[in-house]
């Protein structure tokens, strides 16, 4: 989760005093990197995935499942057995926000050959097996986007009570600080977001109105005035960073061959973010209730929203410099490539001094405004040992701001003095239950980048329409019910990367004729006379590539999953979870997920993930049986 400096974290007041210093030197660090590597070309295609995991403990006797707060110990063991013993170990493990979470990546990035697609799932299996092997009896490693009873009494093991007093990090009514990773970054981030905002974060998620759900659904918090004011009728109220950052996701990072290719990919993939988010929907439950949304994006956005009342436009600007329209965790606000310029129709708040400085240093308008927009934010954490740095050889101040702008896409300059190239990170996906599904989504996105670059595809539409798509993508059953703005003719491009922009795009104004509302089925699978479909385009690309039979078979299986999720033939994880709850004998059609229901659901998820049972409505009936079977949590053990 971004920069993980070690050391002594400063208080919020001290961090604030150094904010201008961090921004000033962050920009100098960016300029050093930019001037050193702006002309670097021919970096090879490399890419890698990041999977976030939750650790759970099953109490089979009492039919209860809890989040296991020993991520630190598990991580230490995995790193000791892995990368510290063998630098070429096939897996890497990193901390995540929750003390019940860990993050796993391949040990080395994947390369540009087609056969690499056949190794993704094997590596994910290795990770699952490796982490499972260090767990105790009745414990399991799960890839679940949101734990349904996160924030309910007794949801952690060991159990801890929330402490809503001022001294803590969250001050939450529901989420104990013990559930936050012990690394100083995470608790400090939590505390400083709250201090900067001037109040606790506010998350209100619409409740799903079932037959017996109270109407209006109202929760009362007589002991907490802040919560009483912030909670809304017919909504599930949450009050801590952990409700967002304590969820799991799936991300992919690509290295481009040059800065211009990275900027082109950043823009093109930004339009795909809402589509893939809806396709990967996997988080319908919050704080023990069934919600009316399927994705975590809005929850996580609100959970780290550090904007003050002035910045949110609720009071006139007096102590702050800017009115800011979005949380620092949200969709991108500007395209970076020349082709995207005319589609930049969102008002962009920038630090004009930084913008002018960047222009004077030879940075073009589009990149300068992107960086000047990121730098309207304050640093949220600062370590005493990291205040005075060598700007020519270090980038911690730049990364401090960059890594706490959590957007759908991230444009990543190389670290100083490294052979790493310009990268882009694709960030909107929800994590899936199985390694097969997670591999399918990763391979789909990576293949799409190959096709975008090979065929010079153009998905650009006005950025305001992408934002509208992001809102639709989070709605319940968006994959089947939602309509999304999408470009009609995606094949007009000339040599988009080399020329910076295709001939077809030289007109200064975008035309409403260029895009229309489409279903995800149309976007993914195509519709005659309307749109060719992304999967038919990927298939045509594959037909022209040298691919061995085994790899081709794997890729086709992955694409079949995406195709069938888009058409509705297979369910999203969110829809499958809703059906599971609705059909549970203990469910009272009141939108409440009890310990018993939660236990049954997570147990089933774990069995599916470890291939101890089939789930044709989620994976398809022909889902191939694999040799690996892990997990130590089945009650039949």
From Swiss-Prot:
The modification Phosphoserine is found at residues 5, 8. It comes from the Eukaryota. It is an enzyme of class 6 (ligase). One of its GO terms (molecular function) is protein-containing complex binding. The keyword Acetylation applies. Transmembrane segments: none annotated. Keywords: Acetylation, ATP-binding, Glutathione biosynthesis, Ligase, Nucleotide-binding, Phosphoprotein. Feedback inhibition by glutathione. It catalyses: L-cysteine + L-glutamate + ATP = gamma-L-glutamyl-L-cysteine + ADP + phosphate + H(+); (2S)-2-aminobutanoate + L-glutamate + ATP = gamma-L-glutamyl-(2S)-2-aminobutanoate + ADP + phosphate + H(+). Most abundant in kidney. Also found in liver and testis. The keyword Acetylation applies. GO terms for biological process: blood vessel diameter maintenance; cell redox homeostasis; cellular response to fibroblast growth factor stimulus; cellular response to follicle-stimulating hormone stimulus; cellular response to glucose stimulus; cellular response to hepatocyte growth factor stimulus; cellular response to insulin stimulus; cellular response to mechanical stimulus. Its EC number is 6.3.2.2. Pathway: Sulfur metabolism; glutathione biosynthesis; glutathione from L-cysteine and L-glutamate: step 1/2. The modification N-acetylmethionine is found at residue 1. One of its GO terms (cellular component) is glutamate-cysteine ligase complex. Catalyzes the ATP-dependent ligation of L-glutamate and L-cysteine and participates in the first and rate-limiting step in glutathione biosynthesis. Heterodimer of a catalytic heavy chain and a regulatory light chain. Belongs to the glutamate--cysteine ligase type 3 family. This is Glutamate--cysteine ligase catalytic subunit.
């Amino acid at each position: 989760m971004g920069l993980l400096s070690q050391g002594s974290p400063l208080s919020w007041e001290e961090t604030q005093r150094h904010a201008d210093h961090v921004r000033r030197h962050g920009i100098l660090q960016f300029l050093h990197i930019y001037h050193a590597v702006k002309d670097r070309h021919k970096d090879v295609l490399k890419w890698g995935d990041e999977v976030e995991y939750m650790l759970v403990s099953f109490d089979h006797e009492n039919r209860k499942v809890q989040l296991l707060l020993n991520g630190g110990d598990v991580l230490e063991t995995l790193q000791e057995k892995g990368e510290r013993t063998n630098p070429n170990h096939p897996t890497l493990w990193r901390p995540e926000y929750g003390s019940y979470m860990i993050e796993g990546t391949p040990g080395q990035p994947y390369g540009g050959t087609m056969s690499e697609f056949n190794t993704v799932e094997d590596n994910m299996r290795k990770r699952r097996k490796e982490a499972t092997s260090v767990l105790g009896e009745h414990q399991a490693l799960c890839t679940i986007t949101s734990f349904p009873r996160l924030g309910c009494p007794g949801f952690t093991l060991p159990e801890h009570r929330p402490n809503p007093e001022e001294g803590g990090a969250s001050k939450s009514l529901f989420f104990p600080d013990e559930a936050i990773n012990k690394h100083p970054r995470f608790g400090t981030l939590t505390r400083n977001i709250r201090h900067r905002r001037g109040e606790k974060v506010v998350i209100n998620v619409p409740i799903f109105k079932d037959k017996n759900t109270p109407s209006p659904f109202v929760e009362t918090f007589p002991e907490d005035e802040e919560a009483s004011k912030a909670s809304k009728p017919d909504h599930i109220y949450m009050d801590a960073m952990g409700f967002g950052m304590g969820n799991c996701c799936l991300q992919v990072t690509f290295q481009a061959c040059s800065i211009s290719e990275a900027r082109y990919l950043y823009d093109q993939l930004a339009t795909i973010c809402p589509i893939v988010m809806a396709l990967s929907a996997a988080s319908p439950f919050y704080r023990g209730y069934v919600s009316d949304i399927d994705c975590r994006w809005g929850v996580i956005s609100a959970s780290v929203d550090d904007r003050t009342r002035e910045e949110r436009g609720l009071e006139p600007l007096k102590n702050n410099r800017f009115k800011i329209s979005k949380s620092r965790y949200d969709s991108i606000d500007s395209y970076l490539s020349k082709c995207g310029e005319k589609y930049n129709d969102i008002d962009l708040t920038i630090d004009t001094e930084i913008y002018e400085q960047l222009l004077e240093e030879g940075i073009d308008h589009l990149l300068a405004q992107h960086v000047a927009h990121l730098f309207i934010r304050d640093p949220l954490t600062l370590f005493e040992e990291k205040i005075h740095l060598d700007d020519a050889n270090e980038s911690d101040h730049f990364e401090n701001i960059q890594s706490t702008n959590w957007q759908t896409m991230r444009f990543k300059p190389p670290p100083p003095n490294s052979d790493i190239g310009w990268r882009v990170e694709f960030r909107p996906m929800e994590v899936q239950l199985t390694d097969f599904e997670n591999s399918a989504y990763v391979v789909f996105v990576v293949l799409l980048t190959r096709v975008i670059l090979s065929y010079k595809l153009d998905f650009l539409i006005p950025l305001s329409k992408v934002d509208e798509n992001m809102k639709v993508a989070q709605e319940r059953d968006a994959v089947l019910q939602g309509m999304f703005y999408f470009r009609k003719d995606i094949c007009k491009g000339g040599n988009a990367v080399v020329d910076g922009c295709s001939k077809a795009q030289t007109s200064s104004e975008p035309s409403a004729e260029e895009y229309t509302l489409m279903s995800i089925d149309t976007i993914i699978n195509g519709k005659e006379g309307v749109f060719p479909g992304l999967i038919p385009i990927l298939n045509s690309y594959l037909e022209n590539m040298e691919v061995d039979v085994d790899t081709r078979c794997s890729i086709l299986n992955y694409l079949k999953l995406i195709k069938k999720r888009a058409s509705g033939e297979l369910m999203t994880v969110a829809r499958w979870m809703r059906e599971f709850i609705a059909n549970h004998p203990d469910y009272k059609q009141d939108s409440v997920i009890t310990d018993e229901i939660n236990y049954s659901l997570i147990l089933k998820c774990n069995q599916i993930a470890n291939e101890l049972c089939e789930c044709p409505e989620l994976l398809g009936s022909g889902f191939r049986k694999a040799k690996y079977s892990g997990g130590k949590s089945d009650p039949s053990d």
